[in-house]
From Swiss-Prot:
Gene3D superfamilies xrefs: 1.10.286.20, DNA helicase RuvA subunit, C-terminal domain, Elongation factor Ts, dimerisation domain
Keywords recorded for this protein, A-Z: Cytoplasm, Elongation factor, Protein biosynthesis
Molecular function, one GO term: translation elongation factor activity
NCBIfam families tied to this protein: tsf (TIGR00116)
Gene coding for it: tsf
Entry function: Associates with the EF-Tu.GDP complex and induces the exchange of GDP to GTP. It remains bound to the aminoacyl-tRNA.EF-Tu.GTP complex up to the GTP hydrolysis stage on the ribosome.
Natural source organism: Clostridium perfringens (strain SM101 / Type A)
CDD domains for the chain: UBA_EF-Ts
Protein name: Elongation factor Ts
Length: 303
């Protein structure tokens, strides 16, 4: 009988997953040393040992169905920009993106348990890739898009450094819609809006900005009776910066995104609205590990 204590010990020694450790111990009739060898032979121990490294590089990949009715965006991380360009790594990211679009998974854990290559799960394929390439990798996040009237569009910038996906609703069917959607995606990539419209700005963020602007105005020595007007003016400016519909279009600074949609709606004969968007920037929010230079030199010198 394989005990929980034995599984725990094997996990601590190899860093491999719980189920992999249990299988290895079962295969070797509980022999700890042989189980370690089994995991090493399968590449699972080596892969798991790399899991302590920070994976802050990688790629953002998108998938849009041929009819443009559904799509997905995923971020998959690795340790170096060199591996981020590896064909197998990029191919894996593309297949995962397509899987997300065609599945009902809601969490990364559920995605990792989905079948990707025949009987192999995403996690198993990823583990094999880690062992083969020799770097830690992780599926970090994803979003799925689906629309009935309208379309889904995507845009990738900088070879996967930034990825955007947007969902536009429109009753009319026109090539113009795809063009508008591409422009909207490029806008999101370039201007990084936080909200769709002023109505979507959460009250907490708004109040925080108001406090900052009020303090700035008072510190500038402005009279109390005009401070409120100044604050409202600066809030309006803030919304133009962070709300997609209020932003100046990157292709024409005299026109806002809402104005662009208004013009194109007239052109296609039906209202065009943005119902959802997301922007992923590779590695954002991941704290990279900083190596101590002296330690690095010592390591290279074999000290």
């Amino acid at each position: 009988m394989i005990t929980a204590k034995a599984v725990k010990e094997l996990r601590e020694r190899t860093g491999a997953g719980m189920m992999d450790c249990k299988k290895a111990l079962t295969e070797t009739n509980g022999d700890m040393e042989k189980a370690v060898e089994v995991l090493r032979e399968k590449g699972l121990a080596a892969a798991a040992k790399k899991a302590g490294r920070v994976a802050a590089e990688g790629i953002v990949k998108t998938y849009v169905s041929e009819d443009m009715k559904k799509g997905s965006i995923v971020e998959i991380n690795c340790e170096t920009d060199f591996v981020a360009l590896n064909e197998e790594f990029v191919g894996f990211a593309g297949r995962v993106a397509e899987l997300v679009a065609n599945s009902n998974v809601n969490t990364v854990e559920e995605l990792l348990a989905e079948k990707l290559d025949g009987d192999k799960t995403v996690q198993e394929v990823l583990t094999e890739l880690i062992a083969k390439i020799g770097e830690n990798m992780s599926v970090r996040r994803f979003e799925r898009f689906s629309v009935e009237s309208g379309l889904v569009q995507s845009y990738i910038h900088g070879g996967g450094r930034i990825g955007v996906m947007a969902e536009l609703a429109c009753e009319a069917s026109s090539p113009v819609l795809a063009e508008v959607a591409k422009d909207v995606c490029m806008q999101i990539a370039a201007a990084n809006p936080l909200f769709l419209s002023e109505a979507d700005v959460d009250q907490e963020s708004l109040e925080k900005e108001k406090e900052i602007y009020r303090a700035q105005a008072l510190n500038e020595g402005k009279p109390e009776h005009i401070v409120d007007k100044m604050v409202m003016g600066r809030i309006k400016k803030y919304c133009k910066e962070v709300c997609l519909l209020d932003q100046a279009w990157v292709k024409d600074g005299d026109k806002s995104i809402s104005k662009l949609l208004e013009e194109k709606s007239k052109e296609v004969g039906s209202p065009i609205t943005i119902t959802k968007f997301v922007r992923f920037e590779r590695g954002e929010g991941i704290e990279k590990k900083e190596e101590n230079f002296a330690e690095e030199v010592a390591k290279m010198g074999g000290k």
